């Protein structure tokens, strides 16, 4: 440890400011960890671990609001004296070091107490986690590669949010840090790769992973009907047309199989064959309506529907791999990635409904899943103002989150932002208990629910968040044994 200064006037049990020794202002920087020997080197009241934030440089002769000789001298090109300059940092206490780990500090931090900078050999995390059952991430404290970051294993199923603007490194962080962590904790990982570019290309050749295209997966019949409802503008607003679609969807897998066989035998497009089967079925149902007025209305609605609805709209829901078979593949693989690239939004959301309903039913049966569900582009599933099928997906995420805490289901939601149009629905976000904040979008810099509201109580400003380098994240919440957010980073493996 290195002595760097003493506690200044105005300290409390939760705040202190250290005045740096002369010459250390260029060496000591924000986010470093320090140890306060509260009360002095000899017989201190306690020893407090803290993190440096909020640096401040003071020179009373260089105030921009008053005219002094030093200011005049500087205006004409001179260099004023630095003899009375004072440099300081605020200290956010992490906790008191005890034989059982860390405890909250309840004693006033005494002015004049010496402050020591922790160096590479003074790894503090062994002190933090003495009581907790922890795993160690491959991430480390910024500036100290040997200080691996501990994670409280118990809180993994309490759900995770990863936030960062484009280019902040959130996908890399998830691939290289979170997914290996979940596997180390005994979880199987299912990744929903919304664009098909952030995860699927990196796991295609991995022996412990499998990539499957969304178009190969079938949906449950309720989700197929929700998808068709969205694509047909609520079946043209006609109950008879809706009933016709509903009856066709019954036994969907068999109908898809029949269309595939016929297409192969006759050299046709499978989706065109299935489309014709569906259209003929709907027209037949309408033809059998006995009430003349109802029949006329259904015919008009049917024409509207099939002007809007095209054969290619069926392609995303013609898969044959069931959700049960998809989850079954997790028994032999650590990781399965669903490549959703190229599919229509409605098809992606329809698949998620099928998956989430099945997961929920398993948990209702009392089964512990031990699955981590990683959802890229989470606002697509749970936007701030959900409409249509997104209302259903948002509600299902809330249900999964509530029951998942008890049934070992981890939800990891990845988003460009925290609030508003780039963020996750507020009701869903309240279910996430661990957060990784990367470089934020300017829309998140202020206002209710933004990054500033989450982190400013810990001395982290929006200015800092806007300027974070890629791959740097503030780690906060239930999985972090430290009650104060810590700035962490990682080194992606070569190749």
Placement of each model-derived feature along the sequence:
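Basic- and hydrophobic-enriched, low-structure N-terminal and domain-boundary segments
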Residues: 1-159, 163, 177, 366, ...
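Glycine-rich phosphate-binding loop of nucleotide-binding enzymes
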Residues: 132-216, 426, 437
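Loop/turn-to-beta-strand initiation segments
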Residues: 186-190, 332-335, 367-372, 406-413
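Walker B catalytic acidic pair
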Residues: 194, 376-378, 384
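Catalytic P-loop NTPase motifs of RecA-like helicase/translocase cores
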Residues: 198-199, 381-385, 420-421, 444
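Helical/strand "switch-coupling" subdomains that flank nucleotide/phosphate-binding cores, especially
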Residues: 208-319
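Conserved helicase/translocase P-loop NTPase motor core
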Residues: 313-372, 381-389, 395
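Conserved ATP-driven motor cores of ASCE-family P-loop NTPases powering translocation/secretion/packaging/pilus
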Residues: 398-403, 407, 411-487
